């Protein structure tokens, strides 16, 4: 079934803006056009606006998924010039100026006058996608809930294990990737074990768990520089996190992981719970855009190499923002997406008023507001311009910044309350786990494989019938 979400603009009709994605770039673009004389269609494959920087707190039981992922439709319900569509974009026709999305068996074709592509990024396993079965990433709510099930489930399995080696394996946690997400996850697993779970088991001592932070790079938090990276590493090591650098993961399976050292030697770590926080790849829409335009290229991560005004070459009405765009010096962080969205919407407002000259647009300029990473309760590292600081005040700055960027007063109050319980005491309010959290991904993968197998068999049978008839 194919539906149309709008007709081509009549002469003098309202300008139609299509936004793909409901992350930082997509949501901020929609809100920035609130008072503009435009009709907006926001298309997203999820129903929520996800605050990704706090996913690790969902995985470690501090926050609920609702605290960091309010419903996009409800956020924008008072903005009457926005329509929200749930669906996965499977085609962008730059010549016809349409976006095709699919939800179940329904296909929707949405025309546009201006397009903002803010589809974000996904976890990258550097060509080893089979690792995902045993080492979930940290990009979606599903990822975070699965990891919560695996982390807490590892302690439960260790409690009933009677084999010493198996118990040690269950209590070994490996986090791959020493960027902000990896550092934060490793620190929170330690705090979960030492504070929240203290005294809750009878045959194991949770604080005796082994937490390993791995990275192929030679330093922790490379983008933040050697000084802050070293401070973060020392703090982690003080918490008994084993920081292992220059260590490349070459294999991941149910029992553990295999690592290749800098000198070429390999070693094995037996572990039950693996967290993949290393590397991102742009949405497949980047490749789709490049293939549909003349002269547009993508980089190795799949990001679109945009023009200075964030547009696709030859298409001054098509903007790419956030993790999907490649602009030298602009990191893949929330601020890059937000600033890119504001720039694109400013240009669109000029277009609507007839004041835009594509050949003379001011280029996008990124203002670096700094970066932060929390390590543990009362400890973080922060970089703001040339200023670098760590410890308690960096942690306070981290708290304030994340509260400001959470969408909605309800979510801010809920997060503040949960943080108060967790940081001033031991408790965490989101410790429930279910079998669905742990096994749903695997079951869905198996079902998809079975469906593909059935489809292939049907196609082969049809082909055989045609040959017999011909």
From Swiss-Prot:
InterPro entries: FAD/NAD-bd_sf, FAD/NAD-binding_dom, NDH-2. GO terms for molecular function: NAD(P)H dehydrogenase (quinone) activity; NADH:ubiquinone reductase (non-electrogenic) activity; oxidoreductase activity. Its cofactor is FAD. FAD binds at residues 21-25, 89, 323, 334-335. It is found in: Cell inner membrane. The keyword DNA-binding does not apply. Its main location: membrane. Inhibited by phenothiazine analogs. Keywords: Cell inner membrane, Cell membrane, FAD, Flavoprotein, Membrane, NAD, Oxidoreductase, Transmembrane, Transmembrane helix. The chain crosses the membrane at residues 389-409. One of its GO terms (biological process) is biological process involved in interaction with host. Belongs to the NADH dehydrogenase family. This is Type II NADH:quinone oxidoreductase NdhA.
């Amino acid at each position: 079934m194919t539906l149309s979400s709008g007709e081509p603009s009549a002469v003098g009709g309202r300008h139609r803006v299509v936004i793909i994605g409901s992350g930082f770039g997509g949501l901020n673009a929609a809100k920035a056009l609130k008072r503009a004389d435009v009709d907006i269609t926001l298309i997203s494959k999820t129903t929520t606006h996800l605050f990704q920087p706090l996913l690790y707190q969902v995985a470690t039981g501090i926050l609920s998924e609702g605290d960091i992922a309010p419903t996009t439709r409800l956020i924008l319900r008072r903005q009457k010039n926005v329509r929200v569509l749930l669906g996965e974009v499977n085609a962008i026709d730059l010549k016809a100026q349409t976006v095709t999305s699919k939800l179940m068996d329904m296909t929707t074709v949405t025309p546009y006058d201006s397009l903002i592509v803010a589809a974000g990024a996904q976890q990258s396993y550097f060509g080893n996608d089979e690792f995902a079965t045993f080492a979930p990433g940290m990009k979606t709510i599903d990822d975070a809930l699965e990891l919560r099930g695996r982390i807490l489930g590892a302690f439960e399995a260790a409690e009933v294990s009677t084999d010493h080696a198996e118990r040690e394996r269950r209590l070994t946690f490996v986090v791959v990737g020493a960027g902000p997400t990896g550092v934060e996850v490793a620190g929170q697993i330690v705090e979960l074990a030492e504070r929240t779970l203290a005294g809750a088991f009878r045959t194991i001592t949770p604080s005796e768990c082994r937490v390993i932070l791995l990275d192929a790079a030679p330093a922790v938090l490379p983008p933040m520089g050697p000084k802050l990276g070293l401070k973060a590493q020392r703090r982690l090591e003080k918490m008994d996190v084993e920081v292992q650098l220059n260590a490349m993961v070459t294999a991941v399976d149910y029992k553990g992981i295999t690592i290749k050292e800098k000198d070429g030697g390999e070693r094995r770590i037996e572990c039950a719970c693996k967290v993949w926080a290393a590397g991102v790849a742009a949405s497949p829409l980047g490749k789709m855009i490049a293939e549909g335009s003349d002269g547009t290229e993508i980089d190795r991560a799949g990001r679109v190499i945009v023009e200075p005004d964030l547009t696709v070459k030859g298409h001054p009405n098509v903007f790419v923002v956030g993790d999907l765009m490649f602009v030298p010096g602009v990191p893949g962080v929330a601020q890059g997406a937000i600033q890119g969205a504001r720039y694109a919407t400013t240009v669109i407002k000029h277009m609507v008023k007839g004041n835009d000259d594509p050949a003379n647009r001011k280029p996008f300029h990124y203002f670096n507001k700094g970066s932060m990473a929390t390590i543990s309760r009362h400890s973080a590292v922060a970089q703001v311009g040339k200023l670098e600081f760590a410890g308690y005040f960096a942690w306070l700055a981290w708290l304030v910044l994340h509260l400001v960027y959470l969408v909605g007063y309800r979510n801010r109050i809920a997060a503040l309350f949960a943080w108060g319980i967790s940081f001033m005491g031991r408790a965490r309010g989101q410790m429930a786990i279910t079998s669905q959290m742990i096994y749903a991904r695997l079951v869905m993968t198996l079902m998809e494989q079975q469906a593909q197998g059935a489809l292939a068999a049907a196609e082969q049978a049809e082909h055989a019938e045609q040959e017999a008839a011909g």
